[in-house]
Amino acid sequence: MRQKTQWETIRKVLRYIRRYRIYFVASILLASVNVFGTLMIPKLVGEAVDQMLDTGQVFYEGLFAILWQIALFTIIASVAQWFMNLSNNKMTYSVVRDLRRDALEKIETLPLSYLDIHPAGEIESRIIADADQFADGLLMGFTQLFTGVMTILGTLVFMLSVNTTLTLVVVVVTPVSFVMASFVAKKSYHFFKQQSEIRGDQTAYMNEMIEGTRVVTAFQQQEKVIEDFSVINRELTDVSLKAIFFSSITNPATRFVNSIVYTSVGVFGAFFVMSGGVTVGQLSSFLSYANQYTKPFNEISGVITELQNAIACANRVFELLEQPSESPERAGAVSPENFDGAVEFSHVDFSYVKDQPLIEDFSLEVNPGQRVAIVGPTGSGKTTLINLLMRFYDINSGKLAIDGLSIEDITRQSLRNGFGMVLQETWLQTGTVRENITMGNPTISEEEMIRIAKLCHINGFVSRLPQGYDTVISDDGGDFSQGQKQLLCIARVMMGQPNMLILDEATSSIDTRTELKIQEAFQHLMEGRTSFIVAHRLSTIRTADVILVLKDGHVIEKGNHASLMEQRGFYYNLYQSQWQH
């Protein structure tokens, strides 16, 4: 099964290489020229030796002619090798570039369920670290494998032209190297694959801990974090040592075999010289060829070991690429440019895990322009409703429609373009403030941008930056406070002018003073737009047209703030408990 997996991975890699077949062919041709030039040199050296020994005198004219030929073939071989390396580099890094691009494109199409259960660090490790390891192995394979195989074939031809018996001595002993390399390759692949997987776990854990440094410090969990990391580190060290142990056997073992070959040729060759079967110059050439013949076996065995690591890493990247994407768009799905904002849930059932229902028989009608607040305890299904609206997940049964159209009959791009979404977790990209806030509407005018910036209360602190709206910020927001980053995200949504809004915990990380400032802006933004508001701070949703109180996936109360307070039910108790605190 493992062997089958390796060959499947190799076939997938070859499909990428096929795109750059011109470099592949060029590498083979250049490798042939390099090998031919290299192998001509021992032949010429042997001729020079025989010329001097046969006559006992040195004919400088003939010797210089041979030396010029040696110099010419040396230059040809060197130039061919240089261009071969350029071609190999171009092919390798083009393949890795395509692989990374496809991996990133794949991430953009993966269902949220995959991203929910796979840490970001583990995915990053596949795209960055594993792709780098794959590139190193592939480059070594192209650089040494082509030349090595051709050197073996070329030296075999040259040795046969000198003496068949001596050639048989070399050929009979050398296959021992292949047997050793095959054994080592099987063993090392298993450990290199484990090494890649644990490296991914280590990267994921590091990312998680770095992002949560404040929490770790606040709860004095440094020792536990170090202990947990040490466990992963020890596992990686153990597996790496095993992988290196088996891969390190290859070189000394094959060198030992090569020494036997070289010694055998020397002994048998001496008898042939004494019997007149070969000349001293021919034996000199043959010894050089024997060395060149056995050397690639040593290199190829090392390359095979490195390729095992590369294949293991490539397999992890392909595992990501082969994950099922979001379900395809339904045939005939439409792409409305605008939505009125009428939303209908009709007997909707949904569960993240089979046989563990979260939302059951949920029904709701929302008229265009209504503001719907969703409240309830943790795990009640608040965020799940948002996930269903954005079609991050598909409902199990029932119907979810916008403007009378089932959301499955609307393309995901059009559906998601119709919503403006403010999340609790702020997300900014490296770039200017302007690029961040106009992401959803790059063509917005300067005047309109400033107007909305003032409504969102960002114009003041942005204008004080060194380059104002053209100041470059990092993805973590740099020196901006959490509240300022939240305001930037809100401004980004407002500038996109969406038809519908989703405010998921939008003001939970903003201080009371800042919260009061943005409420006015939100009122302006929500005017005439269907809005869904998820918040734990009930004081922020008192103006909602409809408040849904969820518990265990069911609507247990429904109404506006005043009517729900009059009922003195779950919402009333929840509101009172927050007000008192």
Task: List each model region and its residues.
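Short intracellular "coupling" helices and adjacent cytoplasmic loop segments at the cytosolic face
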Residues: 1-3, 93, 101-125, 129-131, ...
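A short amphipathic helical element positioned immediately N-terminal to and/or at the very start
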Residues: 6-19, 123
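Juxtamembrane loop-to-helix connectors within ABC transporter transmembrane domains
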Residues: 17, 49, 84, 88-92, ...
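Transmembrane helix-loop-helix hairpins at lipid-water interfaces of multipass membrane proteins
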Residues: 24-80, 87, 161-165, 276-280
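A hydrophobic transmembrane-helix motif
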Residues: 40-42, 46, 75-76, 81, ...
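An intracellular "coupling" helix at the cytosolic face of ABC transporter transmembrane type-1 domains
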Residues: 112-113, 129-138, 142, 150, ...
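Cytosolic ends of transmembrane helices, especially the final helix of ABC transmembrane type-1 domains
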Residues: 221, 245, 262, 292-320
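ABC-type nucleotide-binding domain
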Residues: 329, 336-581
